[in-house]
Regions:
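Carbohydrate-active catalytic/glycan-binding domains of CAZyme proteins
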Residues: 20-349
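Amphipathic, heptad-repeat alpha-helical segments
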Residues: 339-380, 395-396
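Sec-dependent signal peptide recognition
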Residues: 2-8
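Charged, amphipathic alpha-helical scaffolding segments
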Residues: 379-387
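Hydrophobic h-region of N-terminal signal peptides that target proteins for export
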Residues: 10-18
């Protein structure tokens, strides 16, 4: 396929997205919360402006990690809407940080038609690619932060992620410094498997947390990533461990890097960048996790090149996000999520409510109601049914 055809295909995809954006109502943020097993689970939050978010389900997980991950914990969820407008995809790191930062060998693929009930597949790289040189369990130590993008040339989704291997490490004093490169694969139509990894981007030092978006105005793909090299400080500001930008005419590269950090200057490291378009606007938000400081930082751009600081959004209360991603959802999808959340919160409240004065008959009635409510929560995404059941639980 010629490049002009690819450009036309990419433009068509942007036109489709523009058409769908007429139904966009708000922003859904999918994230994990902290470095504990409870925190390393998928959580949701909603926003009307893309900057200020309110947690769903009282800040509790939406998807339980022990039901989807080989490590029983996840990190770095990336969520997006499929090209058909009705299917949703989520990919994430299969990792438990308490086992160490060099302990993860895989990622998770998830697919849903309602944002609540997901089919899932865990991909363990040493098992899936046993004959691939350098990807054995004794050498591979990181498969981090997967994300998705549609490849018009291939006609399928490309998944890309950071790989860390022991044979790439280099000595620094009496220690060895990790080295990461970005790789990519293609996902099958069932969203249950990936092709053999291929090199996407080698920065020349460690690079993680890739995020690619197509810029139709300039006919190029823009890759945002974290410079994970050893930090140095110049006049109080870090010259490493910030968000950088690279561009390419083809999705799989080669990418040319601009050697400057995009985030607001500071002495603290950042990671987990994610770019999304503002609803009803041609402007974009670049957000990233200021993980050492306890807030997310948001910057705005009209050209995906020059960014202006907007605000720091504190992580507090039930909203305590770490590396995640944002997508647009419709009013109906929001209603569904809020109805599901209302029932989940009501169930939790009733389970926790002391019942020392209840009769045996009342206790049996509560047990049956909770069983029915949990079954409804697990089986349906119908907002009316969810709200009706929530009202029954709240009224008990």
């Amino acid at each position: 396929m010629k490049r002009t055809t690819l450009a036309a295909a990419a433009a068509a995809l942007m036109a489709t997205a523009a058409g769908q954006h007429q139904q966009d109502s708000c922003y859904l943020f999918a994230f994990f919360s902290n470095n504990t097993p409870d925190g390393e689970q998928v959580r949701y939050a909603l926003s009307d402006d893309g900057l200020n978010y309110t947690s769903l389900n009282g800040g509790r997980p939406v998807v339980a990690s022990d039901t989807i991950a080989l490590k029983k914990s996840i990190r770095d969820p990336y969520i997006c809407r499929g090209r058909d407008g009705r299917t949703f995809y989520m990919v994430m790191t299969d990792m438990r940080s308490s086992e160490g930062w060099q302990s993860n060998d895989g990622l998770i693929l998830m697919k849903s038609d309602d944002l609540l009930h997901w089919q899932h597949t865990a991909i363990d790289f040493p098992t899936r690619f046993p004959s691939l040189e350098g990807f054995g369990r004794d050498n591979l130590h990181a498969v981090w932060a997967p994300q998705l993008i549609w490849d018009a040339r291939e006609g399928r989704y490309m998944i890309y992620y950071s790989i860390g291997r022991h044979d790439w490490e280099y000595p620094v004093g009496d220690k060895r410094q990790p080295y990461f490169k970005l790789f990519y694969s293609y996902v099958n139509d069932d969203f249950t498997d990936i092709t053999e990894p291929r090199l996407l981007f080698d920065f020349g030092t460690a690079a993680i947390d890739g995020d690619i978006i197509y810029d139709g105005r300039n006919g190029e793909y823009v890759l945002f990533f974290k410079d994970e090299g050893l930090p140095t400080v110049n006049n109080g500001f870090r010259t490493r461990q910030g968000v950088m930008r690279a561009t390419a005419k083809e999705l799989t590269g080669p990418y040319a890097t601009e050697f400057r950090h995009l985030q607001k200057p500071g002495q603290y490291p950042v990671e987990g960048s994610s770019v999304f378009r503002l609803i009803g606007s041609d402007d974009y938000i670049l957000m990233y996790d200021c993980y050492a400081q306890g807030y997310y930082q948001f910057c705005r751009s009209s050209d995906l090149k020059n960014f202006t600081f907007v605000q720091n959004t504190p992580t507090r209360g039930t909203f305590t996000p770490r590396h995640g991603s944002v997508m647009h959802i419709s009013a109906a999808e929001r209603d569904r999520l809020e109805a599901w959340s209302a029932l989940a919160v009501a169930i939790d409240a009733l389970e926790r409510r002391p019942a020392p004065t209840l009769t045996l008959r009342q206790l049996d009635g509560r047990r049956k109601l909770l069983d029915e409510a949990r079954a409804t929560l697990a089986a349906t995404a119908d907002a009316k049914r969810l709200r009706k059941m929530a009202a029954r639980v709240e009224g008990f």
